[in-house]
Amino acid sequence: MKKLLVSLCLALPFAGFAQNIKFTEYDLPNGLHVILHEDHSTPIVAVTVLYHVGSKNEQVGRTGMAHFFEHLLFEGSENIGRGEYAKYVENAGGALNANTTQDRTFYYDLVPSNQLELGLWLESERMLHAKVESVGIETQREVVKEEKRMRYDNQPYGQLFPEALSHAYKKHPYAWAPIGSMEDLNAAKDEDFVNFYKTFYVPNNAVLSIAGDINPEQAKQLIDRYFAGIPRGTKAIPRPTVVEPTNLGEVRDTIWGKDELPMILEAYHIPAQGTPEFYAVDMLNTLLSNGQSSRLNKHLVDEKELALFCGAFTFNLEDPGLTLAFGLANMGVDPKTLEDGMNAEFDQVKSELVSEQEFQKLRNQIESDFIQRNSSMAGIAESLANYHTYYGNANLINTEIERYMKVTREDLTAAAKKYYTPQNRVVLYFLNDPKLSSN
């Protein structure tokens, strides 16, 4: 039964997507924004809370705090014993998790619809009564250290993402990955964690988004019962205002490690999500890298056999993000040859208009991806919260696709010429160091 519920919530297509996704939204007096989407196609409900805090809200010397709290806030609360948080949801036949980005931290509980009250109680406990104390802090320090060792330090090409950020951002706090610095976490005192919690984990910095088999009026009553009494935060919520300079000249570096085959990474600065040019850039990256027939894969992997794999994706962020392009060189291929091949693909979208046939295929891919993002209750709840947080307009869940459809072939060429330039990029070579490999 448990596996069935989780599978339904995560994978079942949302039958009514062809119609608008209907929702209601309102604010509690304490500033908590609430979004409700009613859907009775399956007896499940996604109870989610998005806190508008990510690694960009951290200070130099105290990095990793946002991601650390993603772990710490499963430790328990004044009314939930240590290690008992997940058991409540699992015993009810549901699943729960959380994730942290540069811009937000997102918690979700996927439960049978008759357990809506349980999900609301658990999330209210996280917001009001979480245990931020030495025992949990020390426990999670070790958990996060092990995560860093597994995902970054001992993972092939594990430094790819952190190195891309630190080279691309010199002013903005996007310069570090959400995992942060273990030295910073070790240096943080208990009062640092308490202050972080009291600053960011407050109703006026959160969105409660619920999607699924609910009675909206009953849900509102339960929300009022569990959240209306939580005090509004009194601390000023810091938001970075620094703008990362762009087009300052190409940045090149070599990162030596134990990885056997050369990896090339290029990072191009792009506009913030939601701007007209962003949609053109995002479509370009889909053109270059989405699927086996995409340009990078077709030309550099299949035809020229320069790379074992090659791709690009949009690292879209609340503030201006990046296009990240990467290629793993085939055995015996000079990394400079692979870089030249990657650059040739970027140059082509600058010099040649995309054909009508390829453009129509691209539009179809964009539309399919948009539908897929909102094909589960959890996906709908997250999208509604994201659109409200980043744009102040949750209805973009229905209309953002129109912004993509307004992009023309000429817009693609113009965006490529503006953003895919050498002076606007970082180029990193990840090469094998025989001395490290032998140790």
Label the model's feature ranges:
Residues L4-L5, A11, F17-H33, N215-W256, ...:
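Proteolytic maturation boundary segments
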Residues H37, T42-S55, G64-A66, R82-M127, ...:
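M16 family metallopeptidases and their MPP-like homologs
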Residues T63-S77:
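Active-site SXXK
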Residues E75-G76, M127-V135, V354-S355:
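Short, polar/flexible loop-turn hinges at active-site or ligand-entry regions and domain interfaces
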Residues R141, V194-Y226, Q423-N424:
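Non-catalytic, conformational "gating/processing" segments within enzyme and secreted inhibitor domains
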Residues R149, S166, K235-S293:
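His/Glu-based metal-binding/catalytic segments typifying zinc-dependent metallopeptidases
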